[in-house]
Amino acid sequence: MVYSYSEKKRIRKDFGKRPRVLDIPYLLSIQLDSFKKFTDQDPTGERGFEAAFRSVFPIKSFSGNSELQYVSYKLGEPVFDVKECQIRGVTYSAPLRVKLRMVLYDREAAPGTVKDIKEQEVYMGDIPLMTDNGTFVINGTERVIVSQLHRSPGVFFDHDRGKTHSSGKVLYNARIIPYRGSWLDFEFDPKDALFVRIDRRRKLAASIILRALDYSTQDILDLFFDRVNFKIKKDSLVMDLVADRLRGETASYDIKDAEGTVLVEKGRRITARHIRQLEKTNTTELEVPVEYIAGKISGQDYIDPDTGEVLVSANADISLEDLAKLSMAGIKEISTLYINELDNGAYISDTLRIDSTTNRLEALVEIYRMMRPGEPPTKDAAEALFNNLFFSEERYDLSKVGRMKFNRRLSIDDDEGTGILSKEDIVAVMKNIIAIRNGFDEVDDIDHLGNRRIRSVGEMAENQFRVGLVRVERAVRERLSLGDLNELMPQDLINAKPISAAVKEFFGSSQLSQFMDQNNPLSEVTHKRRISALGPGGLTRERAGFEVRDVHPTHYGRLCPIETPEGPNIGLINSLSTFARTNNYGFLETPYRKVIDGVVTDEVDYLSAIEEGRYVIAQAIVQLDENGRMMDELIACRHKGDSTFMGAADIQYMDVSPQQIISVAASLIPFLEHDDANRALMGANMQRQAVPTLKADKPLVGTGIERTLAVDSGVVVAAKRGGYVDYVDASRIVVKVNEAELTPGEAGIDIYNLTKYTRSNQNTCINQRPCCSVGDPIVRGDVLADGPSTDLGDLALGQNMRIAFMPWNGYNFEDSILISERVAQEDRFTTIHIQELSCIARDTKLGSEEITADIPNVGESALSKLDESGIVYIGAEVKGGDILVGKVTPKGETQLTPEEKLLRAIFGEKASDVKDSSLRVPNSVKGTIIDVQVFTRDGVEKDKRAVEIEEMHIAQAKKDLTEEFQILEDGVIGRARNLLIGAGFDEAQLAAIPRSQLLVQTIDDEVKQTELEQLAEQAEELKADFDKKFEIKRRKITQGDDLAPGVLKIVKVYLAVKRTIQPGDKMAGRHGNKGVISKICPVEDMPYDEKGNPVDIVLNPLGVPSRMNIGQVLEVHMGAAAKGIGNRITEMLEEQRELAELRGYIKQVYELGDEVIQKVDIDSFTDDEILRLAKNLKGGVPIATPAFDGAKEKEIKQMLELAGLPQSGQLTLIDGRTGNEFERKVTVGYMYMLKLNHLVDDKMHARSTGSYSLVTQQPLGGKAQFGGQRFGEMEVWALEAYGAAYTLQEMLTVKSDDVNGRTQMYKNIVDGNHQMQPGMPESFNVLLKEIRSLGINIELDTK
């Protein structure tokens, strides 16, 4: 593999044995691609805005004299960029402008004669835009729209598993689910009649819907039944014989062939052998006794030719009397329905008998009564309702997916068709459910991923937009029908509010629009790749059973079987597998390598769950020879959802990668294959809760996906184009672009501005640090700057800690963790948390609130950190209770005496009518002010601090833009100099020419002269562009802010809190091994090895066997080896050994392992590159051991040997307190530990006195309310059991809800009198009141 300059800085040793056939696809593509499809112009009109507009427009007036037509749309540019929107608390959105055409028709002239056409561009609201990282900024906060897994539109057949009826009989049902519109259900009842339901309403006989579709009884019988024809003879009947139909029946007469030989005796069951005999004799007719027809069902109406009387009606049972009547009337042939209890039941016949309707109108009225109970039906209303239900494109849409699924399920060849139902569709569904009931077909598996599809952000936004458009359509249609249209323009007809409201509601408060989990880069990526079965149109937690939540065979390679939340949402919220993607229909598909005659090719096909069932698919771990041929005779594979073994020649596809089945979070766990699945689930989930540490540290033992994840998450800065680094500082990186990658006529400079110390959604700190130096060569995709939790472009969620598995004085009992003081001293787990505190000055009824330093009854010391505007200084160190923003609120006016009025007039004394409502630092918070933002309403005068901040921002913007302009101009001037040197100028001449004159020189060479003129134009454009950018920036900074109604000013203060690790904090490894820190132990007391190196953390060995997460032990061994090799390299560097020896050792490391695919050509590295690599490997050689394809035990031992460590991975440790050796060797090594966002500082809380509940007068609960600890029923029992009567009395009265008692006790304590008089608890009074509210008079007798 070829490594770029920056990749050579540190190379991860990879133990993967399988070649990478397919790179991991861009991890955020599910979000970005979906939204791109929504916003991009689509000429076909199948999706996005275009589809929504075309489905609603043209809007015609009721009279038909006018219509509003859609022409085109365009999305404008956003007013603010993403960062500005976050600071200002506004939505990152762009205005949608639509060109509409209003056409007026001439009433008097011929139909369709146009009288007038008006075209106009109309504003239709703001549409939130997606950022480059797949998020939305809504009201200043980053949100993610989670994709939804819902039931695909189409037709589904199912049964009730025998649960509906007490007999346990299985009742089948069918359901047609459209994308938009009413559901249509067919279901059998216990008596085997078929019923229909529309929108889950009251059920009707299924034949009613057929009658409504204009089928007569005769038509219905012809559709669903074959016929048996009889010729009427004098004493017998002759039946047309179809031999197959007799199978399973008991012969009620002797069955003879044409010669009269008895083939089946009377009373015998007719078997397949009898059928074969009958077929051999070519018997086509069979004479049967007259009694045979009794009870058969007539296939049509039989009418007396003379009188016109119906002798036997269709679907009636035929009796012997009926047969005599038919014979008398001269009818020679009759046909009956072919019904067989075994495989051809009389379901439709039975249904027709319970159907009270006889014609179409009656059926329509019956449907109308069911849908609109209580309304009087008319013919037109009933017809309109029925047509609108399933046959109107406005009200009903199966969608392309639904039609494809519908047609495939019913074996209709064409995958395309209309979005509405046809008569044939409904009949086909009924035939299919009858076939299932007869045993010829099977029900569907609704949990199969072929029956569930993904609805991503673009599709959901489009649906919401269409909802808004439909609301507008109603209003437009009414306006078109009213008033004089000659004066109106399209703008006057359209009100954009309903559209904006629908879109805003979706992005702001939909269940699937979630506050982005921004703990670390992994949590961001997994949130964007989350797939939820909940949400509108999905399941609910309460109704979801085990089957829906369970892992299904079709999840393979599509949804991760590991990563899902623990708790009520388990199985309902899933994560996309690493290589999965959605196809055009929204079904998940996963890639497979094609196998031809047992040889694996590099051709990759993406298969959906439906297609996958048709093929035989082998796993990625199959043994292949050098030509790609499968070596084993029998190969483990999957076919039709089952695991089996087949020969190599039968295999059609093979997995692309062993990591294919798991998600990104799960694939970050090394040695995942050695962990129990439940613990792996916890490990995957806990990595998302890791807080970014102050100093990121790459994992020594990783899986090789760390770099991909860090780059795709967008938290690092990756190079857009190749070149070399021209300038670096803490906030900006400038890259000079390679000539080959330039577009003609551009400056050739890429500027990357870095994000500094901003707050994330979870209050963690987002900060980017450059990781390149001036002069470094760069290729596209190289990491230029690290973000939070990244180290040289690798994801780094935690720290590598030296671990010992041993008990230590009970401090690691029950998963507790003992850590060394050194860990805290070195700030290994120190994290920065940034809190945003807001102070809002409102306009109240009594007057405006004011932000000021002049606060009543506050001492000088409390104001020491405020400036004259009453706002805290940046850099001030504050603690709980300190004032951050001084604010006074007007109090209600009190009646003043004339003397007071006079004094007030003279001295301007205002203190008495305002109260202090300043913003203070919350209790238990201590930190540093790092930023202050002031937002002032348009038209309100800005205070001094706001003006200062404004000026500072303008100066900063000017400085940034000037530097940017300077860099770009230098690029242009540099290219001009090169051009002039090429044209014959020498350095001395150029030095004499002023910089401004370089671009206006004349050259003899015409081509070069043209190039120089182009550069001069470019420089002019840059200058104009700079002025324009600066003016826009200045205007944005100085303009007033659009604040909520009644808000005059908002001050936002950002407070940075540094948190070191301490007892009570939660830590975890990556294998689900979590625990709470019990003690921080002095370094000298920690166990140490024979070389005197103490361990950092002591874990309990009992945490491993019962949890079956052995991966952590292997990680510790491999970590020890990786660190040991790093120590050997450090020694070599310190001892200044020969470079050849260092190169040889590093080469040994990278070449270690059997069948390892990674090839690192260390010999091709220059000496400088070897030294730089060695310096970066001092802390340990990073290892990649991919999931299901990782390092083997033998390789771990080889690594330990190379590091000079015992192959057992165990060392003799010495007790730091006694100096004695522990009696056994201890497993010591390096494990990657995470500090989780469950910090004791956020949970620690104590109450003295505080707020009380209004009704019960008991203290509130929870830290947020400054509440108390609940003393519940069981705690009362405990005190009763101890006989602690006085303590109990205290708990139930003065410490809880005895209002007078607690007030008195407070006074007594102040006075130094430690006595109490308990009174009546308020909750007893509440109980009395509640009993009285039931109408029971209850009096308390206090005698």
UniProtKB/Swiss-Prot annotation:
InterPro entries: DNA-dir_RNA_pol_bsu_ext_1_sf, DNA-dir_RNA_pol_bsu_external_1, DNA-dir_RNA_pol_su2, DNA-dir_RNAP_su2_dom, DNA-dir_RNAP_su2_hyb_sf, RNA_pol_bsu_bac, RNA_pol_bsu_CS, RNA_pol_bsu_protrusion. Keywords: DNA-directed RNA polymerase, Nucleotidyltransferase, Transcription, Transferase. GO terms for cellular component: DNA-directed RNA polymerase complex. One of its GO terms (molecular function) is DNA-directed RNA polymerase activity. It is an enzyme of class 2 (transferase). Its EC number is 2.7.7.6. The keyword Nucleotide-binding does not apply. Coiled coil: none annotated. It holds the Pfam family RNA_pol_Rpb2_2. GO terms for biological process: DNA-templated transcription. It catalyses: RNA(n) + a ribonucleoside 5'-triphosphate = RNA(n+1) + diphosphate. Gene3D superfamilies: 2.40.50.100, 2.40.50.150, 3.90.1100.10, DNA-directed RNA polymerase, beta subunit, external 1 domain, DNA-directed RNA polymerase, subunit 2, domain 6, RNA polymerase alpha subunit dimerisation domain, RNA polymerase Rpb2, domain 2. DNA-dependent RNA polymerase catalyzes the transcription of DNA into RNA using the four ribonucleoside triphosphates as substrates. Belongs to the RNA polymerase beta chain family. The RNAP catalytic core consists of 2 alpha, 1 beta, 1 beta' and 1 omega subunit. When a sigma factor is associated with the core the holoenzyme is formed, which can initiate transcription. This is DNA-directed RNA polymerase subunit beta. The gene is rpoB.
